[in-house]
């Protein structure tokens, strides 16, 4: 964890963007990401146990059975107890790791039957197009806009370098969302670490993910599929606002377009 991450830890301030020298995960913004963090901690617990156990056996063997203390090594042809233990325990530990891992994996693949909102994310070289297809179903209106990265020499005060865009994806917090991901040219990827999602954008194919952002904030992500020269300069910015403010934020920032984009 970086010094900035330690500062966030003690001040209880969320970490929703990549930081220099960051080693840990970003703070969870969705139940999916919280599940990933919990699984990481659970697996790390078993790794520590294995490390301590193996290290103790190794140190004990080096200390008690080196050549000076034991010039004539003892030959053990058969050990039933040891063979049983070394077979059972390596079989049980992967079970404790696999069961929660598969449970999380299947939950990540679940799709909400009736999402409150659907957003389509289309990858381009090197920007993204977002479509709020059900922005106003009664008027058959949709919102479509392009999202470009802000150049390195043109950020405003407080904006993250090469992580900010001109048009953010504004979503309501604590709402079930369906995001449809595709590409218009080459393979891309739509990934936001704080949300625990990474979905490939494949030309001619529609992939979908379901998320529910649990707290308001601004969440940063990047393309995670090498897509050409400017692959590193296609960030993703998702801004979660309250349901009360969502309508006014979208209406003020974006221009509705009638019909499909």
UniProtKB/Swiss-Prot annotation:
GO terms for biological process: ATP synthesis coupled electron transport. One of its GO terms (molecular function) is cytochrome-c oxidase activity. Residues 1-34, 109-261 are mitochondrial intermembrane. Its EC number is 7.1.1.9. Component of the cytochrome c oxidase, the last enzyme in the mitochondrial electron transport chain which drives oxidative phosphorylation. The respiratory chain contains 3 multisubunit complexes succinate dehydrogenase (complex II, CII), ubiquinol-cytochrome c oxidoreductase (cytochrome b-c1 complex, complex III, CIII) and cytochrome c oxidase (complex IV, CIV), that cooperate to transfer electrons derived from NADH and succinate to molecular oxygen, creating an electrochemical gradient over the inner membrane that drives transmembrane transport and the ATP synthase. This is Cytochrome c oxidase subunit 2. Mg(2+) binds at residue 225. The chain crosses the membrane at residues 35-55, 88-108. SUPFAM superfamilies: Cupredoxins, Cytochrome c oxidase subunit II-like, transmembrane region. It catalyses: 4 Fe(II)-[cytochrome c] + O2 + 8 H(+)(in) = 4 Fe(III)-[cytochrome c] + 2 H2O + 4 H(+)(out). The lineage of its organism: Eukaryota, Viridiplantae, Streptophyta, Embryophyta, Tracheophyta. The keyword Transport applies. It is found in: Mitochondrion inner membrane. The keyword Methyltransferase does not apply. Its main location: mitochondrion. It is a multi-pass membrane protein.
């Amino acid at each position: 964890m970086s010094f900035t991450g330690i500062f966030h830890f003690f001040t209880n301030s969320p970490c929703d963007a990549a930081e220099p020298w960051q080693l840990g995960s970003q703070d969870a913004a969705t139940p999916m990401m919280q599940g990933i963090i919990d699984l990481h901690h659970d697996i790390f617990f078993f790794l520590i146990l294995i490390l301590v156990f193996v290290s103790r056996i190794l140190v004990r063997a080096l200390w008690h059975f080196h050549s000076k203390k034991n010039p004539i090594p003892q030959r053990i042809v058969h050990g039933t107890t040891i063979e049983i233990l070394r077979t059972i325990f390596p079989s049980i530990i992967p079970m404790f790791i696999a069961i929660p891992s598969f449970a999380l994996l299947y939950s990540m693949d679940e799709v909400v039957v009736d999402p409150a909102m659907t957003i389509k994310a289309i990858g381009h070289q090197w920007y993204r197009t977002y479509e709020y297809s059900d922005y106003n179903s009664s008027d058959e209106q949709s919102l479509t806009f392009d999202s470009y990265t802000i150049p390195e020499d043109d950020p405003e005060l407080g904006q993250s370098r090469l992580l900010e865009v001109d048009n953010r994806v504004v979503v309501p917090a604590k709402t079930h969302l369906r995001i449809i991901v595709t590409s218009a040219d080459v393979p891309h990827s739509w990934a936001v670490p704080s949300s625990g999602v990474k979905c490939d954008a494949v030309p001619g194919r529609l992939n979908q993910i379901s998320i529910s952002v649990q707290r308001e904030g601004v969440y940063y992500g990047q393309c995670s599929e090498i897509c050409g020269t400017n692959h590193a300069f296609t960030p993703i910015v998702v801004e979660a606002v309250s349901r009360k403010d969502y309508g006014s934020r979208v209406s003020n920032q974006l221009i509705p377009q009638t019909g499909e984009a």
